[in-house]
Amino acid sequence: MSILSALTSISNPMKSSNSNVANGGSKLSMGANSVACGSCGGGNSSSGIINNSDGSQTTYYTYTSPTYQYGYTYSYGSSFSSSSCGCN
């Protein structure tokens, strides 16, 4: 099984680590499995925990800055993982 077919065979591997940008790109918040990389300069960052209806918990990170840095990480078994950080 190739990595591509392995990834497409599992149910939405990025669902728990999605991100969204709001307020003209000045705010970035990310869901579970996210890794905070820090800001690119200026602004504030914070994190917290959301209690989900199914009893699980989601840790979120929020950055408020003109420029921000974001990161995520996820894994499939022990054979595949990915992470990324960048500034926008």
Curated annotation (Swiss-Prot):
The gene is hssl6. Residues 1-22 are annotated as: Disordered. Belongs to the hssA/B family. PANTHER family: HSSA/B-LIKE PROTEIN 1-RELATED-RELATED, HSSA_B-LIKE PROTEIN 1-RELATED. It holds the Pfam family Coiled. This is HssA/B-like protein 6. One of its GO terms (biological process) is sorocarp development. The lineage of its organism: Eukaryota, Amoebozoa, Evosea, Eumycetozoa, Dictyostelia.
